[in-house]
């Protein structure tokens, strides 16, 4: 008989929390009891779990004593305050914030890439879910690096407003609506107007001129892949509700052609490749909403530099970029260690 687990989803009313509940139900995760948890501001609200309706529990008074796996989908401040309470009850935490990603005692996991490091979870009973850009990036880069070592990667990201939470989506919606009725709607969540606009600024600005998002992406990429190639990142916020896109320029240590890259990625887990057969052979963010795969298109040789490939990645940032990856971690956890 399959063992069933007691599960808690913290931040259950947010974008990633709701998607986590959806995916747990879709994939028939073996659940005994499931709890939807959020701040007191969400008390009285309900969320769906498959055909069931869950009432919100307050994080302030929730007892993790009987919980075996907890998905933390709220902000870093919530994780900082409540993850120690969860782990003190022998609960295993899968944290989707950036709080523990740089901790050498906490594995940073993308199941298609570095599942072997999952065994290190029991040092702190915490597993970190990577950044929503890093997940699709390493899914694509790892199988290529396995074939021919990568020397350098130049990354430009085009990140939807859902990466900034429900408040980001609301701001894009309200600003767009206001523009059509000639009404002012000043930025609150973002530093500048996001409707009909984009800006190369996500997070805070560091002294070196890079933003905190760009620094996180470079750090996490090297932690997962191994620090053997150089990385340059520019992160752009775009007026798209859901779906991230990434333009990637990859320099390899030896000769490689676009057809080689396409063949390697066709055999890789979690990837759908689109051949350059016609003018519409590319995938845009809106086309990947609700999809689990990482899509790769516009694969081509860089005409300005030898041994270098350009390609275009698109991914649903709420699914594989966040919720799906964490559920896949939990599935690997129960199949191999619990």
From Swiss-Prot:
SUPFAM superfamilies: Glyceraldehyde-3-phosphate dehydrogenase-like, C-terminal domain, NAD(P)-binding Rossmann-fold domains. It catalyses: L-aspartate 4-semialdehyde + phosphate + NADP(+) = 4-phospho-L-aspartate + NADPH + H(+). Keywords: Amino-acid biosynthesis, Diaminopimelate biosynthesis, Lysine biosynthesis, Methionine biosynthesis, NADP, Oxidoreductase, Threonine biosynthesis. Its EC number is 1.2.1.11. NADP(+) binds at residues 13-16, 41-42, 162-163, 187, 317. Phosphate binds at residues 101, 216. One of its GO terms (molecular function) is NADP binding. Pathway: Amino-acid biosynthesis; L-lysine biosynthesis via DAP pathway; (S)-tetrahydrodipicolinate from L-aspartate: step 2/4; Amino-acid biosynthesis; L-methionine biosynthesis via de novo pathway; L-homoserine from L-aspartate: step 2/3; Amino-acid biosynthesis; L-threonine biosynthesis; L-threonine from L-aspartate: step 2/5. Catalyzes the NADPH-dependent formation of L-aspartate-semialdehyde (L-ASA) by the reductive dephosphorylation of L-aspartyl-4-phosphate. Belongs to the aspartate-semialdehyde dehydrogenase family. This is Aspartate-semialdehyde dehydrogenase. It comes from Rickettsia prowazekii (strain Madrid E). The gene is asd.
